[in-house]
Amino acid sequence: MKRLVTGLLALSLFLAACGQDSDQQKDGNKEKDDKAKTEQQDKKTNDSSKDKKDNKDDSKDVNKDNKDNSANDNQQQSNSNATNNDQNQTNNNQANNNQKSSYVAPYYGQNAAPVARQIYPFNGNKTQALQQLPNFQTALNAANNEANKFGSNNKVYNDYSIEEHNGNYKYVFSFKDPNANGKYSIVTVDYTGQAMVTDPNYQQ
């Protein structure tokens, strides 16, 4: 009987020890699971923070690229404007040079007789008149072409004068007819450049 009691007591202690080991093992496993979950959660948090940081860095890079592109566009536009301004200045200079080189001061023909000057003597403001009238050489060529339509077609320029009427000016040109002694064609050219023969056979 005593042995039986002793055996039961020993069995109870053994089972109790086994149960305690099982609980400790469960607690250990639970702690491992909790630790693993915590580490996994921390990893996710770190990954998320890293992704946010990477996205922020990418955003900074994009903004920097946009800023650089904008600066490049502005520089290109400035360079283009500067080039256009230089080109316009060059064109203006060329136009001014051409205008200066094409300008011909009024002059008389060789051995000119006072024909136009005698018919239309001008005592007004010559500078003001010339500012209103077309280029002298252009007007002279137009008048010569018009004079050659009447009689001989090889008339020679003689002299010029200026006629003024109500503030409007005209050139008055005389052209000698080499085939008719003492005869001249009188041609006017107004401020619009219109040439007109007023007397094809003026006798000096």
Curated annotation (Swiss-Prot):
Keyword list, A-Z: Cell membrane, Lipoprotein, Membrane, Palmitate, Signal
User: Where are the N-palmitoyl cysteine lipid anchors?
Assistant: C18
Q: Where is the composition biased (Basic and acidic residues)?
A: 23-70
What membrane topology is annotated for this entry? Lipid-anchor
User: Any one cellular component term from GO for this entry?
Assistant: plasma membrane
Q: Where in the cell is it found?
A: Cell membrane
What are the lipidation residues for S-diacylglycerol cysteine? C18
Residues of the region (Disordered) are 17-100
Q: Which residues form the signal peptide?
A: 1-17
Compositional bias per record (Low complexity), positions renumbered to this chain: 71-100
Q: What is this protein called?
A: Uncharacterized lipoprotein SAS2259
UniProt organism field = Staphylococcus aureus (strain MSSA476)
